[in-house]
Amino acid sequence: MGSKAKKRVLLPTRPAPPTVEQILEDVRGAPAEDPVFTILAPEDPPVPFRMMEDAEAPGEQLYQQSRAYVAANQRLQQAGNVLRQRCELLQRAGEDLEREVAQMKQAALPAAEAASSG
């Protein structure tokens, strides 16, 4: 009977995490249009509600709050759509990667069998 114990696969050691200085250097070197900076940047920042209370009548205040809410809701919907699209891209890339790994394994298997029997 064959052994039921699985062979343990030795993984390479992980690289050390980046230092704070390296992270800051990367962030400073990133262009302003990098998605890290643009994905959540508000187009029209809402007026703080405390300022509106002092300056405007209650009806106008509610109107401005409603406008700020609608604008924030639109930004959230747009961000959700962007995230959905990027998620789909990542899923497709993952599927492609899995297919390519399977193809490489199939291509490597006959070569490994030939080497072990030869």
From Swiss-Prot:
Family (UniProt): Belongs to the UPF0449 family.
Domain of life: Eukaryota
Matching InterPro entries: UPF0449 (IPR028227)
Coiled coil (residue ranges): 81-109
Protein name (Swiss-Prot/TrEMBL): UPF0449 protein C19orf25
Keyword Phosphoprotein among UniProt keywords: yes
Phosphotyrosine modifications at: 63
Species: Homo sapiens (Human)
Keywords: Coiled coil, Phosphoprotein
KW Kinase (keyword) present: no
